[in-house]
Amino acid sequence: AAEVVGAGQLVEIRSAHIDGCLHHGDGGVEFAERLADGGGRVAVDTTLNVGALDLLHPGKVRAGAHKTDMARRQMAAYVRMGAEPTFTCAPYQVGHLPGMGEQVAWGESNAIAFVNSVLGARTERYGDFLDACCALTGRAPLYGLHQEENRAATVVVDASRVPAAPKERVVFYPVLGHWLGLQ
């Protein structure tokens, strides 16, 4: 993967968020199960994006038995590899908050934007399969937003005069982002 994106080396990561947990076809299930059946284990803290099955209300999912079974198997395979079954597109809202400058490999576009801009951690957009490979190896290609020279802001918002208490609330940054977007 590093070669494909022109990265000369890999970088150690602290966490991963696997976007490829959502069932789009049997190939994704086969990939995840092959890794799990082969003894694959995540090397770093790893969260999972939403799956194609509501595990709390599986009867409300309008899919045939085959698709329901495949979705469940895909989700279960990643859990067997040691990923935390967060099943959310916003892992930062359930306690996963990488620190400033921390190297991570996250899939899911909103999480990537949040991690890179609000938290100041570093990730590229890792799609299905590559996100899992990063989680399993604890490494990601060193390119793009992982590198300092590619992290130049075009807009800087100074929130230093905002008291600390509101900034500690989970809703602060989404509300700030919404308000800024209206400007």
Where is each model-derived feature located?
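Non-transmembrane, aqueous-exposed alpha-helical and coiled segments at domain scale
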Residues: A1-Q183
